[in-house]
Amino acid sequence: MPNTPIYQPAAAALQMVQSNQRVFVHGSAATPIHLMKELLAQKDRLHNVELVSITQQGIDLNSPDLAGHFYMNSLFVSESNRKAVNSGMGDYVPVFLSEIPLLFLRGILPLDVAIIQVSPPDRHGYCSLGTSVDIARSAASTAKKVIAQVNPNMPRVHGDTFIPFDRFDVAVWVDEPLPEVSYSEGANEVHNKIGKIVAELVEDGATLQMGIGTIPDSVLKNLTNHKNLGMHTEMFSDGAIPLIKNGTFNNSQKKIVPGYCVTSFLLGSKKLYDFANDNPIIKAMDINYVNDPRILSLNPKVTAINSAIEVDLTGQVCSDSIGTYQYSGIGGQMDFIRGAALSEGGKPIIAIPSVTNKGLSRIVPYLKQGAGVVTTRGHIHWVVTEYGAVNLFGMNMEQRAKALIQLAHPDHREELERSSFERFKH
């Protein structure tokens, strides 16, 4: 007989979590905030609980009071656990986003408990993983126990989102708003310039992937006159909504899931979540499908738009760390950089402002000591700043250096030219 879950208060339901267990926590807009706050409040009875997750919203896992009780074994570092990971209260697992489900499915990271957030069950007894299928589906299917936060505010999203209610060992009814994020608020003139330059690289009929951040949102604002665009992206944000409504994104040229916007998680405003609710044009699918370079490369003109922390003069891209300080993670950047490169007419793009908020150049002679190389100089193609765009594919290292210097801020070009001369003797 199927295991029939019983609704319980959060405090009682979380008694299922015990010391020395590995616990998966649903992420992004699907972060089960109510359950997580209750779990953290129970810290005194728990020791050495390993929390496995990607980006979390609405909770703080950085408090020194959690040391010894919880260990943050992060698959993608974010503000919620960044201090913890860099202070010894946790660590980071370098892994392509497309391969994270394999850690669960192959028993490399066996899960004792999965804490997820879902929509209420429909008349057939199925709940939706809603805004975040990503790695949650594989986690929920392999964990020994599943605790579900059932939230009427979670949209019922179409695709690979459905999970039977009787899969849960215990359920907690929580009526709370989903966390919201706005990427357009931080946009400035530089981001807008970059958005226009990248938009000029996007051809009609292209299939787009937009990474996380302000720049991808700025690109979307400049695509209103494009035609027959398709969407196959790990993340879906507010900027795509007007382009779907006006027919720019009609997905007519795609070879993989034609006619539908393919994504793996949604993160943005309540407007976005309402738009996705029971909207048949959106297909939210497992991350090991959406981000598989072999699959996405079958689409035409895949244009992958991602950002970075710094790029060296040979084209090495650091996107996950500031020196040895772990800032984020590998995520899906390489999945899409490679997939776009393999696509007929594809364009892998790294788009960055030329300088940081402190005025430091993002085009650098060498990456900082200890920095992680996410996109290698063998995988890099297009680089864009507010000063232009260049395709490094096929260039030797000296040619790359000269091209990248022209994308740097004028205040830093002379220093970069000296570094280039010292290295290449020309």
Predicted regions and their residues:
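Conserved alpha/beta enzyme-core scaffold
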Residues: 1-426
